[in-house]
Every structure is written in C-alpha cells, then in structure tokens.
Swiss-Prot record:
GO BP annotations listed: mRNA processing; RNA splicing
Start-end of each HAT repeat: 107-139, 141-173, 181-216, 218-251, 331-363, 365-397, 402-434
Family matches, as InterPro entries: HAT (IPR003107), TPR-like_helical_dom_sf (IPR011990)
Keyword Transcription regulation among UniProt keywords: no
Gene behind the chain: Prpf39
Protein name per Swiss-Prot or TrEMBL: Pre-mRNA-processing factor 39
Length: 665
C-alpha cells in the first residue's frame, strides 16, 4: 500500500456529539471483562489461543452471530476472484487490499463480513480496517454489530490511541445524550482507554480528549484528577499539558477544582504557614469546615495563595516528568513508523533504535512501561521474530501466562511460518512440564511448513528426552521415507543410525540403516564415515571383518578418486595397526598403489586437456575432507586418528537450509 494504515484516517471525520433519535440505546457490558489490560499480561489459559486450535477459530470466537440479509450465492460477481487470491496466499497483502476495497464499493454486508473477519485473522494490527469495518456496519444501521467490531479491534490492538478515539466518538453519536448511564459508559471507556494506551508516549490526544469531555460535563474536579495522572506520564506534549493545567487552575476557584478533603487539607497547610508567621491564631480555632464560603476579607489572597500552591505542587511533578521525557526523547524521535505495515523497516537503524530503547526501559523503567513499550514495538515490528522472542524472554521473570500469551500471539497470528519462535515456544512448554502441548506446537508448525529438518529433529529430541524411543525412531524413519532427495534421505539415515547405536544400543539395526542408505546414495562420503565410526566403536579384533567391508565399499564404490585413495590409505593404516593377517595388509598395499597410478593417469589426461580431473566433479565438502586428510599424511601422523577425521566432517552444522526455502514473511 502506498499509504500507511495509521494515516488512512488522519483526515477522517472523528464524529460529533450530535443527537440521533432513531438509534436505540445500546447496553454496554463491563469493559473490564472484554478489553485486555496490556499493563498486566496476566492472561488466563483460556484467554490465549491454544497451540493446537486453528487461528481462524480463535479470532472468530470473538465475533457475534451477525444477522445477514444476503445469501452467500448472491455475493457480488467479482468476489470469488478476489477471494481465491487471498485464500491461496493469505500473505498477499495487496490481494487483501483489493478484496476489502471491492466489498466496500459493493456495500455488500455479508461479503464484507466474510472478507474482514478472515483478514483480521492474519492482520489484526491494521487499525484503519477495524474502523472501516465498524463504519460499514454502522451504515447498515447495525449499531450493536458496529460496537462489537470496535471491541474486537480494541482487544486485538489495545494500544491504538486512534481506535480508542474513534470508538469513543462512536459512543457519543449512538448513545442517548444527556442520560446519566451514557456518561457513565463514556467515562468508563475513557478510563479503559487510558489504562490500556495512556502510557504510550504519543497518547496525548487521548488524554486531551478525556479532559475536554470532563470539562464539557462541568466536572472540574474530574479534570484536575486527570491532570494529576497525565502530568506524571512521559508523553510527547508534556509541556502543553502543564500549560493547560495552569490555565485550568487560574480560571477556576480552588474549591471547584479540588475534592472537599483536598480543599480542607490545602487551607490548613496554608493557614499553618500563616500561623507560624504570626498573621493568624492557631489554625484549628477558626478554620472553617471547608464547605462554607470563604471570608470576603481573605478571599482574594487565599484564592491566589491556594492557586499558587496547587501549581507549585504540580510544578515538582512536571520537573520530574520533564527529566523522564528528556531521557526518552531521542529514542522516540528514532521511531519513524509506529504503526504496523507488511513492508520491512527501511533500514537497520529503526531496529537498532527499538532494541536500545527496550534495553533502556528494562533497566530504568517500571514493569508497566516496559510492557507497553514491548507492545508498541511488536506492532511496528510484528513480522520480526527477534522482538517477540525478546518480549517472551523478558516476561519469563514476571509471568508464566504472560510468556505463553506472547508466544501464542506471535506464532498463531503474526509469525505462523517462522521456525525459531515456534521452537522456543515448544521448549518453554516443555520446561513447564506441558509435554503434549510442546508436541502439538512442533507438529502443527511442521504441517504448516513442510521439510524443515530442524523442526523434525527437535521433535525427535523431545521424544528422546521423555523416553519415547519408538516414536523418535518412527519420526526419523518417516523423514527418510518422505525425503525429497538422496542427500536429505542420507542425512536422516545418519541421524537414525546414531540414535539406534548410541541410544538403543542396537548395532545390527544401525548398520543396516547405513548400508541401505549407501545403496541409494553411493557417493555420499558422510555415510561411509559414519559407518566406519560406528564399526570402530566396537571391539576391533572381533569387528575386523565389518571394518574391512566398510573400507572396501568406499574404495570400490563411486566416490571420487581422491576420496577412494584416502579410504585406501586408512585401510592400510588400520591393517598395520590392528590387522590380524599380513596377507590382507600386503593386498591392501598393492591395491593402494593401483589407485595412485590411476590418479596419476587422470591427472596427465587433465593436463593434456583431454579430460576434466575427476576430483573437480566432487562435492566441495568431500574435497575439503580429502585435503585435510592428505594434510595429516604429509605431517607423518603414524597413528590412525579417526576421531579427528570424523570431527572434521561435522565442524560446521548440517546445512538445514538446503532442504527448505526461507519461510515467507
């Protein structure tokens, strides 16, 4: 999209407080049961999507049963074309944009509901589209449904100041004006809004809207109470709020700004000061109760003194808050895109800024401020798993359910195809003793993104750690069976053979796995190396025949000449060090000389330009192995250092990436 979601409604009409006699009054349940308090993150297990539940089911569970007037067969003519595009590729954001634009233009309610509901399963952070959806319901006079859409949106993105403002304007338009219940509902909504989003650095317009509304109602004491809160929160317009607060104090009488208790306490404080100066008698003898009129003789002086003291108290709050703002200002200026977008961040700098800001807040801020900053971060960087992982890691020291909630949102909504987040979620559940939940997370992800070796191996290790050896073996056998290439099949065969030999202590079965793999992938050096390593682990005297058979398979097989010579040299060394028959040693030596002559012949042909050297046709890793082994020979290492040879081939982890493309984002 060319325009950001945050900008879509920047110039839109925020609504008015106009009357609407045709709209029925809507009864609003208690917000506390419906709007997530992002400062706590103490979610119950039922509040977070289950690891094995469908994401769509989780999202749709929040929707009300909406009455419709159109049958599905009456969908607009082009709907199916747009729908198939996003159904085939839910990550095609442009396809979603075209679909939603189309259903809006057609003004087809049922088609719009289907499109918007499915869209928000994948992109719940697009605040502008929640507004579009709610407006669509409202245009069809579905006030209750519009209200529900707003509530679902605020559950999905409770830090959206703009969405809160749109919702409050919606309530002003649709609730009965002048009704006490209406005021209670709106004030309650304001309270939930500032609890959820009021500590956001850019939440000023929400606070200002709250203050203006209380002023309109004539609730000066409530205005003061709101100022008491905002003047202690680091926000972008902190200085503006303090200036408006001073105007609020100067333009109204102190007794109208303060509660009765605050008013009495302030008068006593000032009277006490005057008493010490000798101006008045003991403050307790002649102080009024605080509710009768102030003496005309003292009226002007006392009012000004009280105003001065009120501002003085709040000046201290302002000074401290200004210091807190200054510590965060540079970080806030570095946030160029505070809203969600599918496009990557333009440069590395925004990511670095987020990381440094989070580290600063973790070190210096309260838990509430840290959580709010993380929530802001994962809106802007929702498609970057590193920030979700950092968030979950932070929550480990505060709330087990908080960790689970973070992982659940990341994996089921925003990062359905990112392996690391899923693997860490599964590991977390395993740590908590939820073994079956860990299984489900890994299995579900593997079904979503096929062919990831790292996930299959994590499933195997999970079963092994908990004593399910048969299941671990079955998972590896299944991976061999469904491998897309011989190379992949050989990789899993090596893993299975090592599992059978090291864990289950079943040498014959392990040997069979590797021999079968060699028959299918005769040029894979790793198979021979692992077979040799396994045979060497047994009694050398009793297992001499199997070791020699392994050498012969490599020497007489399809490996490049250089690797065959290497195996031949190792065979000679083995017979020299451990062999029981000198005839076998002499035969091995003669065979080795024959291979060297064959290599010389090939080199001469290559030098004459008649044939490409065979070793250049080999895999890079096989050539590297041969070069290392040749280096050992040149160093005159008499001992058969098989351990070093084996380790060389596993210096670098297996390249899982060759079996799957990077998951789409």
């Amino acid at each position: 999209m060319q325009n950001s979601h945050m900008e879509e409604y920047r110039n839109s009409d925020n609504g008015s407080t106009g009357n609407s006699s045709e709209v029925a009054v809507v009864e609003h349940p208690d917000f506390s049961t419906e709007i997530m308090n992002v400062t706590e993150m103490e979610q119950s297990p039922d509040a977070s999507p289950s690891a094995h539940a469908s994401t769509e089911e989780n999202e749709m569970a929040n929707a009300v049963n909406l009455p419709v007037t159109e049958a599905e067969g009456d969908f607009p003519p082009e709907f199916e074309k747009f729908w198939k595009t996003v159904e085939m590729n839910p990550q095609d954001f442009t396809g979603w944009v075209y679909l939603l634009q189309y259903v809006e233009q057609e003004n087809h309610l049922m088609a719009a509901r289907k499109a918007f509901d499915k869209f928000f399963v994948h992109y719940p952070y697009c605040y502008g589209y929640w507004k579009k959806y709610a407006d669509l319901e409202k245009r069809h006079d579905n006030i209750k449904q519009s209200d529900e859409v707003y509530r679902r949106g605020l559950q999905a993105i409770p830090l959206s100041v703009d969405l809160w403002i749109h919702y409050i304007n919606f309530l002003k338009e649709t609730l009965e004006p002048g009704d006490q219940e209406t005021n209670t509902t709106i004030r309650g909504t304001f309270e939930h809004a500032v609890l959820a989003a009021g500590t956001d650095f850019r939440s000023d317009k929400l606070w200002e809207m709250y203050i203006n509304w209380e002023n309109e109602q004539g609730n000066l004491r409530e205005v003061t109470a709101v100022y008491d809160r905002i003047l202690g929160i680091p926000t972008q317009l902190y200085s503006h709020h303090f200036q408006r607060f001073k105007e609020h104090v100067q333009n109204n009488l102190p007794r109208d700004l303060l509660t009765g208790e605050q008013f009495i306490q302030l008068r006593r404080e000032l009277a006490s000061v005057n008493g010490h100066s000798g101006d008045d008698g003991p403050p307790g003898d002649d102080l009024p109760s605080g509710i009768e009129d102030i003496s005309p003789a003292k009226l002007i002086t006392e009012i000004e003194n009280m105003r001065h003291r009120i501002i003085e108290i709040h000046q201290e709050m302002f000074n401290y808050n200004e210091h807190e703002v200054s510590k965060r200002w540079t970080f806030e200026e570095g946030i160029k895109r505070p809203y969600f977008h599918v496009k990557p961040l333009e440069k590395a700098q925004p990511k670095k800024n987020w990381k440094e800001y989070l580290e600063f807040e973790i070190e210096n801020g309260t838990h509430e401020r840290v959580v709010v900053l993380f929530e802001r971060c994962v809106i802007s960087c929702a498609l970057y798993e590193e920030f979700w992982i950092k968030y979950a890691k932070y929550m480990e020291n505060h709330s087990i359910e908080g960790v689970r909630h973070v992982f659940s949102r990341a994996c089921t909504v925003h990062l359905p195809k990112k392996p690391m987040a899923h693997m860490l979620w599964a590991a977390f559940e395993e740590q908590q003793g939820n073994i079956n939940e860990a299984r489900i997370i890994l299995r579900t992800f593997e079904e979503c993104v096929l062919g990831l070796a790292m996930v299959r191996l994590r499933r195997v290790s999970l079963e092994r750690r908990h004593g399910n050896m048969e299941e671990a073996e079955h998972l590896l056998q299944d991976a061999i069976k469904n491998a897309k290439s011989n190379n992949e099949s050989s990789f899993y065969a090596i893993k299975l053979a090592r599992h059978l030999f090291k864990i289950q202590k079943n040498l014959p079965k392990s040997r069979k796995v590797l021999l079968e793999a060699i028959e299918k992938d005769k040029e894979n050096t790793k198979l021979y190396l692992n077979l040799l390593e396994m045979e060497y682990s047994c009694d050398l005297k009793q297992n001499e025949e199997n070791i020699l058979n392994c050498f012969d398979k490599a020497i007489h097989g399809s490996l490049p000449i250089k690797m065959r010579i290497t195996f031949s040299q190792r065979k000679v060394e083995f017979l020299e060090d451990f062999g029981s028959d000198v005839n076998k040693l002499l035969n091995a030596y003669d065979e080795h000389q024959t291979l060297l002559k064959e290599q010389d012949t090939l080199k001469r042909k290559a030098e004459n330009g008649s044939e490409e050297p065979e070793e250049k046709k080999a895999h890079t890793e096989d050539l590297s192995s041969a070069q290392i082994i040749d280096g050992d020979l040149q160093a005159n290492q008499a001992a058969y250092n098989y351990s070093a040879w084996y380790q060389y081939n596993y210096q670098n982890p297996w390249n899982y990436g060759q079996y799957y493309p990077p998951p789409p984002t």
